Amino acid sequence: MPKMKTKSALKKRIKVTATGKVIREQAYRSHLAQNKTTKQKRQSRKSAQMHSSDLKRFKALI
């Protein structure tokens, strides 16, 4: 059986660290920023670690 290909959409959106953690960008950043508070915009600049419950689903796609 051939190997499964990595999903290109996921490949563009996440990065796996050397220790195996999955880093993703924050959601809700692309538009409608005038409705968001300064604190929301500032905190969404940081990358976030993928939650363990989501990680189980995405391991099959990576």
Swiss-Prot record:
Biased composition (Basic and acidic residues): 53-62
Similarity-based family: Belongs to the bacterial ribosomal protein bL35 family.
Annotated region (Disordered), positions in chain: 31-62
Gene name for this UniProt entry: rpmI
Coiled-coil intervals, chain numbering: none
Protein name, as recorded: Large ribosomal subunit protein bL35
GO MF annotations in UniProt: structural constituent of ribosome
Alphabetized UniProt keyword annotations: Ribonucleoprotein, Ribosomal protein
